[in-house]
Amino acid sequence: MKIIVLFVFAVTAFIFKGNAQKIVPIESNGKKYEVLDMTGKGKIQWGGYEEIAGDAAKSETNGAANTIAIVAAVGENKGYEGKPYAAKLCSDAKDGGKDDWYLPSKEEADIIYTFKEKFNVEERGTIWTSTEANGTQAVTKYWYTGAHYNNQKVDEYHFVCLRKVQ
């Protein structure tokens, strides 16, 4: 009986550990952040084609506000069969016992890029930012050159989540 219990415990511990995402501390210009490396979850959509009201998700500096606006507008992504999307997964993340994760803005992605060797994005890969370009496109960060591009919101790319450390 003890052998079976130990085996079940070991399998459960392995599954739990396998689902945990890596948290990477970074610092830039005296500001401290934690990056939740979600690249292991594979590629995912930014969200549906809902244009976010006004300029609510167009900030190039405030990913937290963008994420709130995206999740409010896209909701459960019913227009795309309820597929998970980057901003929602960041908003719902509880990793490290924290609940203030968000999809980084364009400029916050630039900060993360300076630490790119710490993340599991393929050399010519791309990550989402929370900055909306227009109703059908959002800004992405190209990992190979560091350039930004506007891509279709329903395309699939890697993503990371960010939180500010007080």
PLM features per residue range, with description:
Residues 1-21:
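Bacterial Sec-dependent N-terminal signal peptides
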Residues 16-101, 106-166:
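Glycine-aromatic-enriched surface loops/turns that form tight recognition elements
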